[in-house]
Amino acid sequence: MKYIFSSFALYLIVSWTSESTAQTVDQAAEAATKKLFDAQSIGIELKLQGEYVGKEGDKAIAAQVVARGDKAFHALVLEGGLPGAGWDGGRYAILESAPLTDGRVEFRSPTDDGASAVLDENGLTLKRGERKGLLKRVERKSETLGLKPPAGAIVLFGGSAPNMDAFEERKDIEGMTAPTMFDGHMLAGAVTKRRFRDYQLHVEFMTGWEPQNIPWRRADAGIYMLSRY
């Protein structure tokens, strides 16, 4: 069995000009794309988005806070903990927020069931009737994050000097050579030159900051196996 190792950071909102056959990217698109990954320009919204865990009385409770654009958020409140860490896939509630103001976000239930929450850099304070709990932000990481290629692995992309040698040349709709890399990262649509049958694949992704693109236009990342879903 082959071990295939690859580390990707996909910039999914990229355009290029048809005048050039070189691997260049339009300057306006380049600036816009870099901003999607610049934590400093994103600011506090990025710090507030994420997963929160705590207790409501003696029961575990968790929330996933998602930025929605225009400094607004929604929070998915999960009974028992986070997905894969206590939540059974059943009970949950959704809270919607007013815009972020002075580092503080206030949430209310759209069903007027009395649930509310306040979010700031200290955490998410959740109140439901007489019950109240403080949830703290956590960052979960895969056990294989940053895994180094084992001996004999086929490294498709990554390392200190990533290149596209393992991938086919791409053509745009006019038949001209299209960019395959941007700022050291692979663009979407790359296809390996080699074909594999029995393998273990390690891949890592980074996606851009697009809170306003709800629900299906946000950046995502994935791989087609066998050139299909």
Model regions: which residues?
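Positively charged n-region of N-terminal signal peptides that target proteins for export
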Residues: 1-4
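Bacterial N-terminal signal peptides
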Residues: 6-15
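Generic detector of short alpha-helix boundary/capping microenvironments
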Residues: 10, 38-41, 147-148, 191
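Boundary at the C-terminal end of the N-terminal hydrophobic targeting segment
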Residues: 20-24
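Central antiparallel beta-sheet cores of small beta-barrel/beta-sandwich binding domains
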Residues: 26-119
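Carbohydrate-interacting regions of secretory-pathway proteins
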Residues: 27-28, 82-229
